[in-house]
Amino acid sequence: MTKEVLIHQIIDVLARAGFALSDRCNIRPRSFDVAARKDDTLLLCKVLFNIDGLNEETAREMKYLAEYLGGSAIVVGAKTRDQMLEDSVVYMRYDILALSVQTLYDYFVENIRPLVSAAPGGLYVSIEGDLLKKARTTQSMSLGTLASMVGVSRRTISKYEEEGMDASIDVVLHLEDIFGVELAKPIDILKSCGSRKPRKKAEPEKEEPKGKPGTLLPEDLILNTISMLGYDVLPTAQAPFKAISRDKSSVILTGVSEFNTTVIKRAHLMSSISCITETQSVFIINGRSKLKSVENTVLIEKKELDTISDSQELLDFIEERKDTHEA
């Protein structure tokens, strides 16, 4: 299986599950490959044939983007190290949840939650602690007796009941056989990969500008200007846009560049993503712009930005330009 085949499979699964999808991100490097939304569920999906290809920098950006946009970041792949990903198993890479296409299908199409998570040392299952304790006490069985039957310590059984420790698959099967009840706790993928309340505030690690203030790049100066309008600005390194700008009432995918053919290409992609993320999309042009907008992405010249005094005025400017374009 190639990565291209994998991407098409993922898109097919999400579409079948009822998700609306953005255009594919065709830039390099990229922190995510496609954005998808179904009702209040927003996914930023990174596709990697080998999930170990995810690095810490990309994972960090995925988490911050998802947090700013009120969504969840996931990785979908086919293998890890020298073996294929197991179905119905979830993996973690730098606090980003990773899974196979089949697990994605089971969860979003069939509504079947996985039961097993991979961790150093093997595969583990979370136990329904209340059910275990109820089953044990109903049979008047002591912690010590159950521990001896399963081959673990009394403290371990206590931890299982408190849901403070996962168990191996063999232990869970043994416990279920003893009591005749299902004890494995299904994994909620959205919660596990950090499904957050919309517009929750993120706290990215902000890098200090290199050199003296006067040596800031033009793009950084423009982002500073947007920040002074009242926006919380999250710079990006691997997204189709330069930053996400956010205040209490709006979120803006923000591009910054001189006008060129690449800007038009990125503006198209930003427009598609903004429709899925339900945000505004703006490209600040450092110099003259030959266009006023590209689909839903509004192009604003730097000199026009300099005449705007606050975030509401910027939003009004964006809406006015959109209306003019649609007319």
Swiss-Prot record:
This is Putative HTH-type transcriptional regulatory protein MM_0444. Residues 201-211 have a biased composition (Basic and acidic residues). It comes from the Archaea. SUPFAM superfamilies: lambda repressor-like DNA-binding domains (SSF47413). Gene3D superfamilies: lambda repressor-like DNA-binding domains (1.10.260.40). InterPro entries: Arc_TR_HTH, Cro/C1-type_HTH, Lambda_DNA-bd_dom_sf. Residues 132-190 form the HTH cro/C1-type domain. Keywords: DNA-binding, Transcription, Transcription regulation. Transmembrane segments: none annotated.
